[in-house]
Structure formats: C-alpha cells, structure tokens
From Swiss-Prot:
Active-site residue list: D330 (proton acceptor)
Metabolic or biological pathway: Metabolic intermediate biosynthesis; chorismate biosynthesis; chorismate from D-erythrose 4-phosphate and phosphoenolpyruvate: step 6/7
Residues annotated for 3-phosphoshikimate binding in this entry: K28, S29, R33, S175, Q177, D330, K357
CDD domains in the record: EPSP_synthase (cd01556)
Cellular component, GO annotation: cytoplasm
Subunit note: Monomer.
GO molecular function, one term: 3-phosphoshikimate 1-carboxyvinyltransferase activity
GO biological process: amino acid biosynthetic process; aromatic amino acid family biosynthetic process; chorismate biosynthetic process
Keywords: Amino-acid biosynthesis, Aromatic amino acid biosynthesis, Cytoplasm, Transferase
Name the UniProt record assigns to this protein: 3-phosphoshikimate 1-carboxyvinyltransferase
Length: 453
C-alpha cells in the first residue's frame, strides 16, 4: 500500500452502546521479530496469528529478499525457512519498508552485523524519521554506511562486516528499537554483546531470542533496579520454532477506550498480551477508574495473555509518571482521548519520544484535541488534558500526518463526542490494524468513508 496516494477521509459518528467480543490483531512487535528471527534461524519457523498489516508485510518482503523462503499458508499462518546467521544474501533491489519504523530499524541491526549490503528506503513519513541513534552503535560493531540521506535518514545503504564486533553499549534513551538492533547485530559477533538501559523497555527481542535458542541474560541494574543489563552470547545456532503471536495491546487500546467512553458499552477483548512492559495504558486507565477485568490469564508464545472485559466507566484525571512512558509509548494518543472524557486534569509527563514517531505525535494529538474543543496544554514534553466528565464537543477534522494511531484515536473520540469527528486520511490504519473498521462496526460503531456532512 502506498502512503503517497489520495487521502481517504473517514468520519466517526456518536451512536448507541458498543457490545460484543473480539480478538484484536496480532502484536506488531512480535510479528516483526518472528519474521526476522525466522530469517536468521536454521530450519522452519511456523507463525500463527501474524499481524498482516502493511508494516509487517514489508518486513516479510525484506526477509525474503535477504534469502528466507516465506509462504503464507492461511490467515495469520506463515511458514519461514531461514538461512542461519551469516547465511544471508545481498538483496537484488531496495528494501522498501513503507511506513515501518520498527521493521526498518531492526533490519538495520541484522544487516549491520552480517556480511551483506542492502539499501533501506520508505515512504515520505519514514524518510523524515531519524535513524542516527540506531546507526551509531551498529557502526561501532563494524558496519559501514555506503550512502545516506541528510541526517542519517533513509534512503540509506548499509554494509555489514564478515563478523560483527561485540560491544558494551549504554542506551542514550529507553528504546526497544535501539536495544534490539544492537542485539540482532551481536548475533554475528564472537563473544558477548551487552546493552545497558536506564529504564526497562519492551523485552520482546530478548524473550524471542531465548525462544529461538540464543543465550540471553537479563539482570536488573541502575538506580532502584529500574534499569536492565542485557547480555547476549554471540554466534549461537538459532533453530526454527513455532511462534503464536498474542493480540497486540497497542491495537486493543482503541476498542478498549471506545468501550469505556461510549455510555452503556460492554466489550470483551480476547487473548491480549499482558507483558508488564506493554500494559502502562491499562494500569493508567484503572487508576482513572476504568472497569477493566482480566479473565483467564494464560501463556502463549512466551508471553502472558488474558481476556479483558471492559465496561463503560466514569473516569477521573490522573498524573501519569514519565517512567511509565516506555510501557505505553504508542498509547498516548488514545489516552489523551480517554482523558478528554474524564473529570479533572490528566497530566502525561515526559513525552519527548512522541516527537520522533510516525508524526510529531505530541503536536498532532494537541491539534486534534484543539479541533474538537478539548481543553489542553503542552508544557515542555508534558501533555495536559482537562475534562469535565462530559463528552467533548467534537465536530472537528483531524490532520493525521500519515499516522495510523492518530487516525484511530480520533475516530474513537468521534464515537462518543457530541458531534461527529473526521480524520483527513484513514488509509494508513492498515499499517497496524487492517480490520479496524469492520471490527468496530461489528461492535455497533458508526464509522463511514468521507467527511462529516
């Protein structure tokens, strides 16, 4: 799917309660990593529940171009035959990642640690996103940049070494993408690669490396044990395995918040990943008074999952600490929507990382709130939203800036605001939640093509 085509406006209109049960799409983070580790493993990897959104399909295409055999065997069911560490081939063409920041950055770690040369590119949004933080440690490990756009952006050609150099690297910010890129490059390094993070970020790469047979240790470190030291023993033999992809908590966030703010709603979300490094939004919403019940907690694909029963709730404003940001970095747009229905002020602290997402997400959220009559302010890197416990006015048109999460968040606002809300382009929702529209319609939502009449 091209993100350079004509915009497709979409409008959400307030209506009756939302009711029903759904399984949100497979987790995007785990889907990317399943493709990448399947490429690097020896033998066959079977994936169930893969997210078949544009981002993950771009990563699958890149893995295929680097030598993996990849077959789709049914909905969400994929078979990958890998080439092993050191067995990749130079791709014939450019690796076009579209809008996929995660896929492109993780694959830079893979290419930067192996004896291949590849050119990375993407859409207009990806071309604006900074890659230097990913590249800095990879260059220390022996990779070379053959060519790059200004400021270390794509299009960018990267050449990896015969063997990577093992390093000890302290992350400048809590970032699962940087950590993962270093660990993936370290797979082809003799000896030990160590990553130190001041605050724990998503740990899917560590969990999945372990699942595929790598030796990874994680120990608490830093002030109060909030940080992590991750150590990888290089040049393991990764073995193909079965991966069951749990439902993505970042995608579940949209129907979840919709059920909280549309009066009379009750929705069950099935099989949602409950990894504590991904559930900051649920923790915050419960603090705000949300009626969210965990049912049938169980293990799937190395992760804890649960069914969530969500009922419409009266919410109150809360203070969200900055250290919670890594566990909910993608959920602030939808949290801002929930906060606009709450009684009182919600302050979201330390959101600097939102400025380098698919859009300047902080500015995009603020503009969307302004367009729909929500009282808010930005103070430094903090977002402050004040509600009166009633539905906000709505009636606005929101500029999405090619950002799928901005589009979905403000469509959810439109389901419970006083007047319909239009997003200027809904095409990129397919990036992470291709079935968003039919899923929401099945619950009783009113979401239609075109601008509000």
């Amino acid at each position: 799917m091209s993100h350079d085509s004509e915009p497709q406006p979409v409008t959400a209109t307030p209506g009756g309660p939302l009711n029903g049960s759904l399984k949100p799409p497979g987790d995007k983070s785990i889907s990317h990593r399943a493709m990448i580790l399947g490429l690097l493993a020896i033998g066959e990897t079977q994936v169930e529940g893969l997210l078949e959104g544009d981002d993950v399909l771009r990563t699958a295409a890149a893995a295929k171009a680097l030598g993996a055999q990849i077959t789709r065997e049914g909905e969400g069911r994929w078979r990958i035959v890998g080439v092993g560490i050191g067995g990749m081939q130079d791709p014939d063409g450019v690796l076009d990642f579209g809008n996929a920041g995660t896929g492109s950055r993780l694959m830079m770690g893979v290419v930067g640690g192996q004896p291949v040369t590849a050119t990375f590119d993407g859409d207009a949004s990806l071309r604006k996103r900074p890659m230097r933080r990913i590249l800095d440690p990879i260059l220390k490990m022996g990779a070379e940049i053959v060519s790059e756009a200004e400021g270390g952006r794509v299009p960018l050609t990267l050449r990896g070494p015969r063997e990577a150099i093992p390093i000890r690297y302290e992350l400048p910010v809590a970032s699962a993408q940087i950590k993962s890129a270093v660990l993936l490059a370290g797979l082809n390094a003799p000896g030990t690669t160590t990553v130190i993070e001041k605050a724990a970020s998503r740990d899917h790469t560590e969990r999945m490396l372990h699942l595929f047979g790598a030796e990874v240790t994680v120990t608490p470190s830093g002030e109060g044990g909030h940080g992590r030291t991750v150590t990888l023993t290089g040049q393991p033999t990764l073995r193909g395995t079965d991966v069951v992809v749990p439902a993505d908590p970042s995608s579940a966030a949209f129907p979840l918040v919709a059920a909280l703010i549309v009066p009379g709603s009750e929705v069950i979300l099935r099989g949602v990943m409950m990894n504590p490094l991904r559930t900051g939004l649920i923790t915050t919403l419960i603090e705000m008074g949300a009626d969210i019940e965990r049912l049938d907690e169980r293990e799937e694909g190395g992760e804890t999952v649960a069914d969530l029963r969500v009922r419409a709730s009266r919410l109150k404003g809360v203070d969200v600490p900055a250290e919670r940001a890594p566990s909910m970095i993608d959920e602030y747009p939808i949290l801002a929507v929930a906060a606009s229905f709450a009684e009182g002020t919600t302050r979201m602290n330390g959101l600097h990382e939102l400025r380098v997402k698919e859009s300047d997400r902080l500015a995009a959220v603020a503009a969307g709130l302004a367009a729909n009559g929500v009282t808010h302010a930005i103070e430094g890197d903090d977002l402050i939203v004040t509600g009166n416990g009633q539905a906000p006015a709505g009636g606005g048109t929101v500029a999405t800036h090619l950002d799928h999460r901005i589009a979905m968040a403000f469509l959810v606002l439109g389901l419970a605001a006083k007047s319909p809300v239009t997003v200027d382009d809904g095409a990129m929702i397919a990036t992470s939640f291709p079935s968003f529209r039919p899923t929401m319609l099945a619950l009783g939502a009113r979401i239609e093509d075109g601008a509000a009449a």
